[in-house]
Amino acid sequence: MFILTMGLNHHTAPIDIREKLVFKETEEEMALVTLQQEKSILENVIISTCNRTEIVAVVDQIHTGRYYLKRFMANWFQMDMEKIEPYLFFHEETEAVNHLYKVTAGLDSLVLGETQILGQVKHAFEIAKQTETTGTLLNKLFREVVTFAKKVHHHTKINENAVSVSYAAVEVAKKLYGSLDNKKIVLVGAGEMSELALQNLAGSGIADITIINRTKSNAELLANQFQAKVGAYENMNEHLMLADIVLVSTSATEPIIKQAAMQDLMEQKASSMLVIDIGLPRNVEHDCSYIPNFHLYDIDDLAGVVSANSLERQRIVLELENTIEVEVRNFFEWEKQLGVVPVIRALREKALDMQEVAMTSLENKLPGLTEREYIQIGKHMKSIINQMLKQPISELKEMSVEEDATTSIEHFKRIFGLSETDVTVIEKEQAETRS
């Protein structure tokens, strides 16, 4: 078993790519189940936010795991694998675990130290657990990672004066206008990002805030918390006509603010308008940025606003990286103690040895086989082996954390004819690899 992470984020892919590769909240469970059915995938969790789409998986082999993760992503989003591959990154084993710790603690965020990602990772894990696509390894890993991130935010100053994408949006408005006194603001959307924006706007001198949302009751709920007004969704353009600042963050999969409509609106509007689109996929058509006096910012444009973190933050990050390395080592020490990893690898090696013997016999008995035929038969035989071993391996992992784990593992080894020598050799190789 190996831990493998594949994904893309604000470091590796621009927003026009990221917005095409976002898992819809309504499809999360189906995506998890679909991925779990792929060959090589033993466990999986999908993390999908405005700045990243990442899959953390347990796979039986690294190279096949990489292929099937890429294939799943391409198939799910109906894109050619070659088109998305340049934007993907992979982390294996210690790098994968280290990366997850950093992501969850906010060290890999667009906004260093932001706390929103902790809730998003926790939510992703809970969905995967409910969907039963996690097992022994990922259950342990995500629990440890979430606990660590909570301690980080509680005991350090990494999230002091908490900054977020919503915070950055408000800072952009302040830079453009100076004082926000007497400015009229319209929020389109009533979700978490809008709520965070309202929290950051509190005390900024804005007295005229209107919230517009397709579901009016959600807008009313948020408006009551912040003494804001509610506007009718169908009258959005009328409210935009009067706005100085517009923050847009909805779950829409297509732009809801169109270039043609905004062109007409801005020709009639007497003043300029700042529009900050923090949705992903983007909620405002990119061509709106070419309209005179229509100042459009998206998530990637906000990066410069929040990149200048304090020296104190940077110092804390260095300290945390050292602490994370210790956490990662502890996790793999725990994994070794499971006792099943060497057993699984010994089982796989025994199966592959049997395949090699069978292929040699086949070559001797059918000397007329072409090289292409020989290779194809070998691939199909390996595929059968992988499929046959997938369920026993999953069951063994679960046995390893039961009360009678030692007895169960010994029975498993007996059933599959694994000797102590077979397992010991793998244990030594594993120790040398991680030392």
Curated annotation (Swiss-Prot):
GO terms classed as biological process: protoporphyrinogen IX biosynthetic process
Alphabetically ordered keywords of this record: NADP, Oxidoreductase, Porphyrin biosynthesis
Active site: C50 (nucleophile)
Coiled-coil boundaries: none
Sites where the protein binds substrate: T49, C50, N51, R52, S109, E114, T115, Q116, Q120
Presence of keyword NADP: yes
Its EC number(s): 1.2.1.70
Gene Ontology molecular function: any one: NADP binding
Site (Important for activity) residue list: H99
Pfam families assigned to the protein according to its UniProt record, in alphabetical order: GlutR_dimer (PF00745), GlutR_N (PF05201), Shikimate_DH (PF01488)
Enzyme's top EC category: oxidoreductase
Pathways involved: Porphyrin-containing compound metabolism; protoporphyrin-IX biosynthesis; 5-aminolevulinate from L-glutamyl-tRNA(Glu): step 1/2
Reactions the enzyme catalyzes: (S)-4-amino-5-oxopentanoate + tRNA(Glu) + NADP(+) = L-glutamyl-tRNA(Glu) + NADPH + H(+)
Binding-site residues, NADP(+): G189, A190, G191, E192, M193, S194
Miscellaneous: During catalysis, the active site Cys acts as a nucleophile attacking the alpha-carbonyl group of tRNA-bound glutamate with the formation of a thioester intermediate between enzyme and glutamate, and the concomitant release of tRNA(Glu). The thioester intermediate is finally reduced by direct hydride transfer from NADPH, to form the product GSA.
Family to which this protein belongs: Belongs to the glutamyl-tRNA reductase family.
HAMAP family documented for this protein: Glu_tRNA_reductase
Domain notes: Possesses an unusual extended V-shaped dimeric structure with each monomer consisting of three distinct domains arranged along a curved 'spinal' alpha-helix. The N-terminal catalytic domain specifically recognizes the glutamate moiety of the substrate. The second domain is the NADPH-binding domain, and the third C-terminal domain is responsible for dimerization.
Function per UniProt: Catalyzes the NADPH-dependent reduction of glutamyl-tRNA(Glu) to glutamate 1-semialdehyde (GSA).
Oligomer and partners: Homodimer.
Name of this chain's protein: Glutamyl-tRNA reductase
Organism of origin: Listeria monocytogenes serovar 1/2a (strain ATCC BAA-679 / EGD-e)
Lineage of producing organism: Bacteria, Bacillati, Bacillota, Bacilli, Bacillales
